[in-house]
């Protein structure tokens, strides 16, 4: 809790982003934000919302079921691209980066499926936690899974699972536990890591003949793609969560700040320190820092 509190700013009447979290004491009861989200999704009036709320399962059952569903979906996603790669329907490098992009985007998109209980984030955290355990087991060669290794590593070596892929799921885990769905910091950080960094590699491999003068491993096309895709995905995910009532966004202010965050993440991704610090660590950490500086002073928790 102390870690989460450190990222919250002072209350302001003109706050850029307002959390819609329910009170802890009434976490299991339908909140105004929850009712609003149901109205948005159903397109119906209050009576239907009340009926749906009355018929809703207990939070622990809802969160448990969603956790199982998302865990199965994450496993299936990797298996599908394993199969596509094995059949030579998609290049290995492209398969790896598509999984990189979709894993973060789909995981974030699933957060509204969880209840409004205070324990919901811990259920969501089970998904990246299980994936991290899986990567550790196969990365340490305690068991073997050639399909997994081929689909998410560059050179097909099991020990690679302990670097980029493991860092990736650990950032997912950290973002869920510390920020969750009411904070723009976690949303933007995961958007830049999954979408921005992912598309930078995809575009850079195909159109990256013009290299950066200070880093010959990076290209202008890849860096520009990272800025644009990271910015757009961040904005879309912010729109997604704001439309469901988790955050309020003043877009005239938010878009400029998102552009600054995307620029900072792009600069960090361009720096030639890949051999020392993996992009899956440097990009989200830089994004979190800049997003915290830009957004935290305008963010308040509404109880």
Curated annotation (Swiss-Prot):
Gene source species: Zea mays
- MF GO annotations: phytol kinase activity
Output the lineage of the source organism: Eukaryota, Viridiplantae, Streptophyta, Embryophyta, Tracheophyta
Specify the protein's topology with respect to the membrane: Multi-pass membrane protein
Give any Gene Ontology cellular component: chloroplast membrane
Q: What is the transit peptide's residue range?
A: 1-49
- Write down the superkingdom of origin: Eukaryota
InterPro entries assigned: Phytol/farnesol_kinase (IPR039606)
Q: What is this protein called?
A: Probable phytol kinase, chloroplastic
**What are its GO biological-process terms?**
vitamin E biosynthetic process
